[in-house]
């Protein structure tokens, strides 16, 4: 994976209404870029056109982000994500990117990317995600992996607790029968 250097800790921004637009061929080589993209990147149009789009790749962005992007695009599907890009000077800028394949019939012949300014919250979440991935951790915190499991088992847990309480209150045989009857509507 390309490692563009140098990098600084200076962030550049662009107006919220501005759109950074570029197109590439099927291999990711830039074929078009608008003035806004040229301006924020710090590269000249001549340096950008015919260069691989990863020219603006910032080394803080984990390779897994781009692997996911390319996997999605090669399936003919659009991809969205918050990406930290590197300027020619080493400064950086954040984008909320929407990348879509360009088709000729059934064949992908290139890609178009429209990027807008992300919110501060989107940037904060992306930085946290990038940091987790770059530290070799799972993209999803371990504690969040239990939520779907808990949601699947919640009706059973509630019924079993209800059964126990009813069993204590009535007598174990009646409590079980009543809890079984109550569990039918819960699934």
Language-model segments: residues:
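PAS/PAS-like sensory domain cap-loop motif
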Residues: 38-48
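PAS-family sensory domains
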Residues: 84-89, 103
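Conserved hydrophobic beta-strand signature of PAS-family and PAS-like sensory domains
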Residues: 30-31
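Short loop/turn elements at sensory-signaling interfaces that couple input to output
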Residues: 98-111, 116-125
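PAS-family sensory modules
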Residues: 1-25, 116-154
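Alpha-helical transmembrane segments and their helix-membrane boundary motifs
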Residues: 140-187
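PAS/Per-ARNT-Sim sensory domains
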Residues: 49, 59-75
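N-terminal sensory regulatory modules of PAS/LOV and PAS-like folds
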Residues: 45, 52-54, 61
